Amino acid sequence: MWPAVRNAIRYLALALTCAAPMAQSAGTSAIALRSRYRIVLAADSRVVYSPNHGATECKLFEIGDVFATVSGLAHYGSSFRATDAIRDGFGTSGSFRDHVAGTAYSLERRIDKLLTTLRQTNPAAYRSLLQRSAQPSDFVELAVAQSVNWQPMLGIVELRRVSGQPLFTARTTICPGKCGRNSEIFYLGYWERIQPYVADSGEPRTVASAASIDRLIRMEMNAHPAEVGSPINILELNGSGARWLQNGGNCSLPGVGW
């Protein structure tokens, strides 16, 4: 049973999922739950490439034995994919902390390379990305989960623009480690409907079940139907491996069973 989440750590990032230059911003709603024995990743499936072009995509990813969800600039045409930064970070030897730090470093370098290229080849797209990154939110946020020696580990990487500059800096959180001893819940993307439901209910709430997590994301779906949409996919990682708690039919990850 999850402890009351009123004491949970909360992170917010206005999500921008892009797949083509000059694509418009799009929202997402994702949740990462962590306890001593398991990690749960959940996300909606709506992406918006332009005002008149949306699609349904799985927002849960498998990179080797690492599972992730991405909020923010998940990909930009063929020039940038946030999952490549995860592949870089976890592709070398080291501890889980080292891998998360490597992911953050790679993410910074890849974003810098993208912006440098756009500044030289497509100034309009460059200005559009910088304008978008000026919002008071994380430009890219990743939640990565891996089972290390039968212990599920969670890493959060937040990439935010340095105020007034075309530079980005990354911050990392490791669980267990920087996180407290209790369970935590991390929100990625829209959460203004979820937050009062969870934190201001007047009594402790638990969100351990797939049905509870689904309900939270549907609150944001109702509030932002153009940017947050079904199906909602939920996976659980514990010391034995990963399994689906809910699969809407659009996620196919070889390492996740039932």
Task: Describe the function of each predicted region.
Residues 1-12:
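Bacterial N-terminal signal peptides that target proteins for export
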Residues 10-20:
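Bacterial N-terminal signal peptides
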Residues 24-258:
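N-terminal nucleophile
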